Amino acid sequence: PVTPSLLRSSVIAVPPLAREADYQISDEENRKIISHIEAGGIKTLLYGGNANLYHIRPSEYESLLKIIAGEAGEDTLVIPAVGPAYGTMMDQAPALKASAFPTAMVLPMQGLTTSKGVVDGLTQFARAFGRPIVLYIKNPGYIEPEDAARLVKSGHVSFIKYAIVRDDPSEDPYLDRLVQVVDSKLIVSGIGEQPAIVHREQFKLAGFTSGCVCLNP
């Protein structure tokens, strides 16, 4: 399982997904990226927005899972993403359930959702997957903090990736509410390096994601 101590043990790298000139997923180039990151001591890889999984073809999803799982070391935690559409994630659930990934991040859907609907949809996906998910909060209207807390208490969430951009990250009423209802040890800063210090020191978040470490771990 993904524990708070595991979240604290490594920066969370968010690598790109390498493709060939014909747009097929590249085994060799992804192996190079993963090996480079691991050589720098990074032990957690999260494949989501930077890997452009919002637009992955359903027909290549199983191949993606095999490649990123097969190229990473035994001590590396690899987390794939699903969605963002409900139908997409439910179709991806069987492949994930058949894999050994301990968790998967649900990419946030923008628009045409309600907080209650998000809770219901993520609950159904978590049950189909059979394991807790990563709740990715990117926009204030996506899910209310209290509903996020309900998901956590239900056991359906491994951790929360918080990524609402603020002009001043120290002034964040949503995050103020979130850490009141969810243990901050289960929340990571998910916007890169710039707000990470404030998120770690002021809000006591467990860790942070980084794209830069994919270049210079």
Feature-to-residue mapping (PLM):
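Active-site beta->alpha loop and helix N-cap motifs at the rims of alpha/beta catalytic domains
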Residues: 1-145
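Catalytic alpha/beta core domains of metabolic enzymes, predominantly
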Residues: 124, 128, 139-217
